[in-house]
Design a protein with these regions (language model features):
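Aromatic-lined substrate-binding rim segments of carbohydrate-active enzymes
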Residues: 1-7, 15
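Histidine-acidic metal/acid-base catalytic patches
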Residues: 4, 48-50, 107-129, 134-233
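Short phosphate-binding/catalytic loops that engage adenosine nucleotides
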Residues: 8, 92, 184
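Hydrophobic residues in well-ordered beta-strands that form the structural core
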Residues: 10-12, 53-54, 96, 129, ...
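Short active-site-adjacent helix-start/loop capping segments
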Residues: 11, 19-23, 198
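Generic beta-strand hydrophobic packing signal
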Residues: 11-15, 155
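Active-site-proximal loop/turn and secondary-structure-junction residues that shape catalytic pockets
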Residues: 16-19, 56-60, 98-102, 131-133, ...
């Protein structure tokens, strides 16, 4: 209610791990992944979030020692369909995320992600785009955005070192120009990591101070996004 009073929209994020991996060969583990993502959707709905985003198509940080198999792809699609239907009933859109090869082996590129979303084939299962991950995995940023554009619902604005957007070497002009070109008109969300949450420090491998304060990050990051938006939209 307080967020509503302030006029603030919100989104939410979730991940899966090895114990609830939606692409596990163990049906019980896959069922746990479905259950936990449905619970995350319920929490998002309770918080008034319009979207639940993240790489919850598979276990983050878990590696099989090989690339994705046909069975894993099938299990992933089958696991996501009931989750997407639950999201529809909750009026929550799912924004699946492709992450880099050092964090995930299942979905790394916008081509991978677009194929997965289309195979799930549910209107509440869509894709998100993250500038950090794409600058690791994609050869051509504009082409990557054009590939995912038909199923795109959410964008993470994230610097190459996870610090304040606009202070690193992400190709921001290419990103914003192409988002404008494809007609994107959804969320632009800062994703940055620092030292404030001890439980995230080890997970995100952040060992040094990335910005002066959370307030500085929010202020300067928002100003950067607004300046980019004002130049194009």
């Amino acid at each position: 209610k307080r967020l509503d009073d302030l006029g603030l929209g919100r989104t939410s994020v979730t991940i899966r791990g090895e114990a609830d991996n939606p692409i596990s060969p163990d049906p019980a583990v896959r069922a746990k992944g479905i259950e936990n993502t449905k619970r995350a959707i319920d929490c998002a709905q309770a918080a008034g979030a319009s979207a639940l985003v993240g790489p919850f198509h598979s276990a983050l940080g878990y590696f099989s020692g090989a690339g994705p198999t046909a069975d894993e792809w099938k299990w992933g699609v089958e696991s996501m369909r009931p989750v997407a239907e639950h999201a529809a009933q909750a009026s929550v859109v799912l924004g699946l995320e492709a992450v880099n090869r050092f964090e995930c082996y299942f979905v790394n590129t916008m081509a991978d992600l677009t194929r997965f979303v289309r195979d799930v084939d549910h209107p509440n299962c869509r894709a998100m785009y993250d500038t950090f991950h794409t600058h690791i995995e994609e050869k051509n940023i504009p082409d990557a955005i054009r590939t995912v554009a038909p199923v795109l619902c959410h964008v993470h604005i994230s610097e190459n070192d996870r610090s304040t957007p606009g202070t690193g070497n992400v190709r921001w002009k290419e990103n914003f120009d192409t988002l404008k070109e494809v007609g994107y008109d959804g969320w632009l969300m800062i994703e940055a990591f620092g030292l404030a949450l001890p439980e995230l420090v080890a997970a995100t491998k952040i060992w040094r101070r990335m910005y002066q304060s959370e307030e500085q990050l929010a202020r300067d990051g928002l100003a950067f996004m607004k300046s980019q938006y004002a130049q194009r939209w």
